[in-house]
């Protein structure tokens, strides 16, 4: 084979490999996490139609208000909760229908462990997230979080 043919083959293979890598990098991001929000021992219900698919990058869907679909890397818990109408800061939580509660700090638990980030927490695949405020048994609240995200692990179409 001549040098020209070898160069042609080399650059063709390089272009093919770069094209395949670019296509893989452009694959859609889609992970899931499970979550619950409790205010004074009562779980907020996000299964209603008014909460479904309110943002493209992060949402609940199909009437399931306990599993979050994450379609963009780096999405924070605070951003997700805002799409549901929940306001969260160091001293208050406001949940639609339940209203505002501002006499103490809300708490965040991720995968059973306390976290300090509150709204700044970046959600990860298969997380089990608990936001709790006020009265209530933390262990019972954590146990009530589903494992639907874990069951969906590896199923990027749902």
Model-predicted segments: where are they?
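Secretory targeting signatures
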Residues: 1-25
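Ubiquitin-like/PB1-type beta-grasp interaction modules and other compact soluble beta-rich domains
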Residues: 20-158
């Amino acid at each position: 084979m001549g040098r020209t043919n070898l160069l042609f083959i080399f650059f063709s293979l390089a272009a093919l490999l770069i094209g395949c890598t670019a296509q893989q990098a452009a694959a859609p991001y889609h992970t899931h996490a499970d979550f619950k929000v409790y205010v004074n021992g009562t779980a907020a219900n996000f299964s209603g139609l008014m909460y479904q698919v309110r943002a493209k990058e992060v949402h609940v869907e199909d009437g399931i208000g306990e599993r979050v679909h994450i379609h963009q890397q780096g999405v924070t818990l605070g951003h997700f909760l805002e799409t549901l109408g929940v306001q969260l800061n160091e001293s208050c939580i406001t949940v639609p229908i339940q209203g505002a509660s501002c006499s103490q700090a809300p708490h965040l638990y991720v995968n059973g462990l306390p976290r300090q980030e509150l709204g700044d927490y970046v959600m990860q695949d298969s997380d089990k997230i608990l936001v709790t405020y006020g009265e209530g048994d933390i262990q019972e609240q954590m146990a009530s979080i589903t494992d639907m995200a874990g069951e969906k692990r590896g199923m990027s179409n749902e």
